[in-house]
Amino acid sequence: MPELPEVETTLRGLAPHLVGQRIHGVILRRPDLRWPIAEQIEQLLPGATITDVRRRAKYLLIDTDAGGSAVLHLGMSGSLRVLPGDTPPRAHDHVDISLQNGRVLRFNDPRRFGCLLWQRDCETHELLASLGPEPLSPAFTGDYLHALARGRRAAVKTFLMDQAVVVGVGNIYAAESLHRAGISPLREAGKVSRERYRRLADAVKEILAYAIQRGGTTLRDFISPDGAPGYFEQELMVYGREGQACKHCGRELKHATIGQRATVWCAACQR
């Protein structure tokens, strides 16, 4: 599933092509995604002008002058591309939003786990209203994590992946951040010290910022809007490397399932 760096990469690739463009039309080839595509998308987008493209957590928000925004989630395997308007659709190209410059914003989603919704006020939408802070914002600190974790018995990796705690940190970047901070993913969240949470918050920020710089992580499905892969995969220290040697100490990396998610860590480097 695309995580925050992949969605941010998508945003940065799309925004220059979309902001200020008037929408000419919308084609829905298959509206029955995990969340059915909102009927307002067909009704209100044609004739509207795109005023901004933003990200909240793993959601892309396409603001318009039609009194609302399109709320888009890439799901497990979705992608967005800006293409010439006469580009033939491929399999799983479910939505086309045609623009005044003759190009088209195309949403492809093979597994149909994504969504394309309409919302007057994005911050009040049920999918967004209860989300935690952005990990790259000043609100996300080690002190914040330490205070919120008090008394929690869940594994710290599960805690870090809770979108009500902090948004956008999924399995890949939680594993990598915990490795950099030297914290075992198995440790109870409430038993991590303030100082170690400060290291963890710094690690999350550093790893996410670098992953964005590298264009995200291409594992199976993610490609950026220009079709390029993400290159952070080459930098992975633990994720997907079970049974291999730790790049820091040479010990064999361990593997377990935590919260129904595969987890890899170094028992020597992470305590």
Curated annotation (Swiss-Prot):
Protein family (similarity comment): Belongs to the FPG family.
Catalytic activity, as annotated: Hydrolysis of DNA containing ring-opened 7-methylguanine residues, releasing 2,6-diamino-4-hydroxy-5-(N-methyl)formamidopyrimidine; 2'-deoxyribonucleotide-(2'-deoxyribose 5'-phosphate)-2'-deoxyribonucleotide-DNA = a 3'-end 2'-deoxyribonucleotide-(2,3-dehydro-2,3-deoxyribose 5'-phosphate)-DNA + a 5'-end 5'-phospho-2'-deoxyribonucleoside-DNA + H(+)
Cofactor: binding details: Binds 1 zinc ion per subunit.
Gene3D superfamilies tied to this protein: 1.10.8.50, MutM-like, N-terminal
UniProt zinc finger (FPG-type) residues: 237-271
The keyword Oxidoreductase belongs to this UniProt entry's keyword annotation: no
GO terms assigned for molecular function: 8-oxo-7,8-dihydroguanine DNA N-glycosylase activity; class I DNA-(apurinic or apyrimidinic site) endonuclease activity; damaged DNA binding; zinc ion binding
The protein's required cofactors: Zn(2+)
Keywords: DNA damage, DNA repair, DNA-binding, Glycosidase, Hydrolase, Lyase, Metal-binding, Multifunctional enzyme, Zinc, Zinc-finger
SUPFAM superfamilies recorded: Glucocorticoid receptor-like (DNA-binding domain), N-terminal domain of MutM-like DNA repair proteins, S13-like H2TH domain
InterPro entries in the cross-refs: DNA_glyclase/AP_lyase_DNA-bd, DNA_glyclase_Znf_dom_DNA_BS, Formamido-pyr_DNA_Glyclase, FPG_cat, MutM-like_N-ter, Ribosomal_uS13-like_H2TH, Znf_DNA_glyclase/AP_lyase, Znf_FPG/IleRS
Assembly information from the UniProt record: Monomer.
One GO BP annotation of this record: base-excision repair
Protein's UniProt name: Formamidopyrimidine-DNA glycosylase
Record EC number: 3.2.2.23, 4.2.99.18
Alphabetical list of HAMAP family matching this protein: Fapy_DNA_glycosyl
Protein's job: Involved in base excision repair of DNA damaged by oxidation or by mutagenic agents. Acts as a DNA glycosylase that recognizes and removes damaged bases. Has a preference for oxidized purines, such as 7,8-dihydro-8-oxoguanine (8-oxoG). Has AP (apurinic/apyrimidinic) lyase activity and introduces nicks in the DNA strand. Cleaves the DNA backbone by beta-delta elimination to generate a single-strand break at the site of the removed base with both 3'- and 5'-phosphates.
Coiled coil (UniProt feature): none
Residues reported in the UniProt entry to bind DNA: H92, R111, R152
Gene behind the chain: mutM
Catalytic residues as annotated in Swiss-Prot or TrEMBL: P2, E3, K58, R261
Transmembrane portions of the chain: none
Domain of life of the organism encoding this protein: Bacteria
